[in-house]
Amino acid sequence: MSESPVRNPKLAWREIDGEIVIISPEDSQVHELNETASLVWKYADGIRSCDEIAAKLAAEFDVALEAARSDVAQLVATLEEKRLLFVTASVEG
């Protein structure tokens, strides 16, 4: 994966007991992320690639890298669909 997710800068968010709560100011909708999605959210800085995030997830939760890659891909797609984050192309160099 050579894509880098980045959080939507228009959203307000806070970490509560290790989980992320996101509030959309446009419609006041609240999104509560589970522990895994919260970790993806924290690493979605537009710099780390999906592969890098998957590696961190695999280490954090002691799961196979391929399983982590699949989880990250699904989470990123879901969060992008909800306009909570955007995906940019990673700069290879």
Show which residues each predicted segment covers:
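Long, charge-rich, low-complexity alpha-helical segments
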Residues: 26-93
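Long, low-complexity, charged/polar intrinsically disordered regions in eukaryotic proteins
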Residues: 1-25
